Amino acid sequence: MKEEKIKVNLRVGLLIRETLVDEAAVEDIRVGTLANRLLQTEMDKVMKVGADNCLIMNSREYLASEAEIEQNRADYYLFPETKVVSRFIATQLDDKIYPQISFYFLKEQMDALEKLVRKQRIPQTIRNGAVHSYRYVIAGMLLNHPLCRVLGASANND
């Protein structure tokens, strides 16, 4: 029996969406299928290193561990800076142009995503103690994927 997946709907920003649309057309698949495939590739990397070893570039935690990260790069997953990721998140203007994409996660992946959101402490992502938005984490992982690196925002070069 297959494990049940949890759905998270998200609008990605215009530049990420255009990159996904172009590649989906080349591969002759749906945008959502491609987006899920890319995100799962990055999610596998996150799950391998664990949420504790996922850091935002140039954050206090990153700067305090920079020497360790350089020596053991494979043990860490780096997210682009929050201000960089925010440029690639949908705005209200984008909402009229592009529909949401449904992303699917296993329970243990959702637990990891929740830990990442809580660790990043980005305003408006947690409300009343509950995770309200995964958009910075998901957009950050998409930006790290080799397909989206053409956008120049990746924190990982592996």
Feature-to-residue mapping (PLM):
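A generic structural micro-feature
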Residues: 2, 95, 130-132
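Short, positively charged interaction helices/loops
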Residues: 45-96, 147-158
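Short, basic amphipathic alpha-helical segments that act as recognition/interaction helices
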Residues: 26-55, 125-158
